[in-house]
Amino acid sequence: MRIGFDHEKYLEEQSKYILERVNNYDKLYLEFGGKLLFDLHAKRVLPGFDENAKIKLLHKLKEKVEIIICLYAGDIERNKIRGDFGITYDVDVLRLIDDLRGYDLEVNSVVITRYSGQPATNIFINKLERRGIKVYKHEATKGYPTDVDTIVSDEGYGKNPYIETTKPIVVVTAPGPGSGKLATCLSQLYHEYKRGNVAGYSKFETFPVWNVPLKHPLNIAYESATVDLKDVNMIDSFHFDAYNKVAVNYNRDIESFPVLKRIIEKITGEESVYKSPTDMGVNRVGFGIVDDEVVKEASKQEIIRRAFKTACEYKKGYVDKETFHRAKLIMEEMNLKEEDRKVVIPARKYAAKLKERANKSETCTVVALELEDGTILTGRSSELMDGTAAVILNAVKHYANISDEIHLISPVILEPIINLKVKTLGSKRTALSCEEVLIALSICAATNPTAQVAMCKLPMLKGCQAHSTTILSTNEEQTFRKLGIDVTCDPEYISESLYYNN
């Protein structure tokens, strides 16, 4: 893989900048936008970026940091899904707490924002409290977003309970956008000043990157990733007016800045040190880019990937038509098309060939996989196994120089697994999933040296690109994710079945 980003340089620059910012205050509330852990978007668009860079940065500062996690009650009620992991936001909070503790970072508490006694939210609160985790409930702020006098009063932020913290840097994070991070920071700021403490607010958001051009593919890829939020990158006019320098920010931050500035000034009783939304940020990711061409190409590929993802989400009913069309429009505005993703054409061509041969109207599932050396392999679904499993077996055979004629998994192993699945567990689908086939391969590896050699090649699939001609099940997507394979799908179901497609 060609590297476009220097991870070590970035870590050094970023930690230094955060410490400089905290020196101005007794306590700094640092709003962490984007993903704190497993930032797969950043990893894809910035080749060389460590997906866990942010948490490693916090680990470096662990003596000075504690963490508050925000979760919007409405996201619990509607079971909002974190797309890259296929888990709900409330489950992601539990995962996040475990991961933070694994890095020796102190989790102060969980804040439920815009709470109004929702039933599913109450169950989640009970679950946390019975495991010894502090939970605070913040209701919707009265007067927000325009009535600053009410917002900054005992009727506004004052109604929220004060979260007791002990360290100079308080990181406020969440599973995703719209979780109430900013409101939590400002509520805390209000309480700190009422107690006579000098506290500050800053924002750490990786995208958009303020010091690369507005129409750079890296920033356009961010628009594509947040297409459901309708985020649009813009020139920060406040920054230009104050410093005569061009900086990029996004519409929500720019639109909310005048009110945010007034709120901070009313809380502190002083003129804000921030002249622009860009001033509020501490992001130094742009300084880690070492090869702009590599980053541009990776970002273009991400835009195509996002268009596929949004098309599938539209088909599943998760997003509206406007979001679907916007993702497609962003791709077309960059003069990109679906076929610019190398694995798309081989998958579609093979599927068309199989469809013609079988003389069926239903789409055949074919998965194409591009290996690190540029080789593209395909696998198709059969009565025995899914296309995902077939292409993985073909890939490990390729890496291990095993002939295509050799069977890695003995029928003696496969038959009882299929019998268990269909006859005992009552599954409607006889075909084994990718995970089931990998388990079967591992069993064979115990007695078959060839299977063992193939098994050892699985880590080589990390970072590979794949495309499926039909929508994959959540289970198949998660297996590919665990293997480190980025997969896209055509927005087509494998059959007309409604439940058994999954």
Curated annotation (Swiss-Prot):
Pfam families: DUF1846, DUF1846_C. Coiled coil: none annotated. Gene3D superfamilies: dip2346 domain like, Domain of unknown function (DUF1846), C-terminal subdomain. InterPro entries: DUF1846, DUF1846_C, DUF1846_N. NCBIfam families: PRK13663.1. Belongs to the UPF0371 family. This is UPF0371 protein CLB_0371. It comes from Clostridium botulinum (strain ATCC 19397 / Type A).
